[in-house]
Amino acid sequence: MEKKHLSLLKAGFGPCLLPCSFILLTTVISASAHAKDATTPLINPHSPASALVRHHTHGQIATISSVTAPHNQSRSPAQKPAKESSFWDAEMLPPLSSRSEAYGYPQMLELNAVPPSLLHQGPWGVFNTNSGAAAGWGTVAYYSNVRWAEDWSRLRNDKNRNKSLEALKFIPFNKDETVYMTLSANFENRNFYDQKAGLGTVRKSPAYRNTLRWSAGADLHIGKHVRLYGELLSGQAGGVNYYGYAGGRWRSKIDAQQAFIEVKGHMLGATMGAMAGRMVFLDAPAYITAGSVYPTVPYSWNGLRGYAFWKNFRVDIFDLMLTDTSNPVAFRNKVGWKTRLFGAYTSYALPKFQLMGQKSQIFIDAFYMGYLLANSSIPGATSNIAGSTHRDTPGVKIWGNAGHVEFSTGAMWQGGNFQAANNGPKRSVSAYFLNATVAWRFSKWWSRPAIGIQADDISGGNMHKSATSKWGGFLSPFVPSAFYLDQSVAFGLSNVIDVGPVITLAPTQNTSLLLKVPVVWRHTTNDAVYNNASTAYNFRPHGGYSATLPQANFTWRATRNLTYSIGAEYVFASKALVQSGASSGAFVLGTADVTF
């Protein structure tokens, strides 16, 4: 019996025991903080309508309050006291829109207005719509997917401070408090159950995977114009009958996940800035990249990034190389020169308007994404063909809300070329990606549900043509959000047509439930089925219909620092897929997240 317990510990369940005490301790601390914060001055949650801005998450939905001021005014006014609130009062909890699942999902539940003291967004004006994701930093609410996107400068005002751990969010170093540091930390534990991993091609029997991630960051602001940010991260992974941990994305000794300098100021009527170093990049639609949600080591990039914000228009330019995490030794991550992302993203906010008694806001985004990949592949008639690729991807996205209708629609065309390995033949590329999500928000119903439909058309190639013919398969190599189409990641966003209902609702102010049932076909039967956007399965089925993927995700924000979520999906593979070697199966994911 003792040996059995020891084997389970080695398999990965043992590491779960260590974080339990950490989670319990954090919950107690957080509860204490909430109890103290019950009398902390907050902006009245019943703020005037002029202080409320409708928020969306990449074409998704969330109404939260956002107060910004011109750069020459103080952004930290003394806050009016609100009514006393208990630890479990949902008004004291940050909105769920800062969760990575929400950021990646094609629609996000509508949230009731929250006090601005529970938002830590930068001075981005109308682009703080969408919980800040419209600004290009990922979602930013109480916390952010990208920790340096949080703005805690309001704590410069003594009346906004409390006695909780938030004191570590604003540590001044000079009398004027213009030089200060913000500390952050995160622990995440994920538990995966795959009944038939990779449609049964990876594991025929159930796989149990367990992952742990620790990170700690320090954000040093030196006056108004300079900031230095550094973040350390470590990840572990284990389980029973587990798979897929090679390459450094799941198991990593402690290393520098981010380290950059930013210089910013005001010029030509805009807030401008430049960043150089290693950083997380999320200024792209969730169906292009969401930073890689599942692996313990998210994507980080090395290079340059510049941005400018005007009143209704912003632009972001970037030239980045992916961090190489393959070395298992601590502090040995390096620039991955073989993988490059470059381009520009622009967004224009149309004037706000009223429709059906609802405040409405629409954004028009135009972008260009360039990829250079030294290691890539396309499917052949019997197996995959290794090589390298260059892709140019211009696109447009129009999203927002018009009254009760909430929508996101986009189109991308992709050119470039693919060259087979060992100086093999070169093929030109011409591919496309069309998508649309439309929902109606029943704002007066219980849980304020949004009921809609999502559809995608992503082109595929023809593996039966000659080795020099034009390739039509669309490529999204940087891990689109798992919550966009398929939580189990059994199907990738290439050679896909999908359509299905989407329902989002908020049973309580600190819980969310998302339901969807996409039905998936191949765009063309002349191309393979993909398990991610850049790798195809080896089986070659007949027929276009691939699978039906009913799935759900429930999230509970227990305290300001502690969040639990559980997602489930069943892959009903088509008869043609099963006959070619695939299997149907269940997928379950549980997550515990502690954020400071």
Regions found by a protein language model. Name each.
Residues K169, A185, W214-L220, Q258-V263, ...:
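Residues on the lipid-exposed face of transmembrane beta-strands in outer-membrane beta-barrel proteins
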Residues F187-Q195, L232-G238, R278-L282, W310-N312, ...:
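Transmembrane beta-strands of outer-membrane beta-barrel pores
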Residues S131-N162, N384, G416-A506, N510-F539:
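Extracellular/periplasmic loop regions
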Residues T559-T591, T595:
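Predominantly the C-terminal beta-signal and adjacent terminal strand-loop region
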Residues P15-V28:
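Bacterial N-terminal signal peptides
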Residues Y193-L212, L220-G269, Y287-A290, P328, ...:
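Surface-exposed loop and membrane-interface regions of Gram-negative outer-membrane beta-barrel proteins
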Residues E2, A31-K204, G217, I451:
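N-terminal periplasmic/intermembrane-space "pro-region" immediately following the signal or transit peptide
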Residues M267-A274, Y287-I288, S292-K465, A506, ...:
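Signature for the C-terminal beta-barrel architecture of outer-membrane proteins
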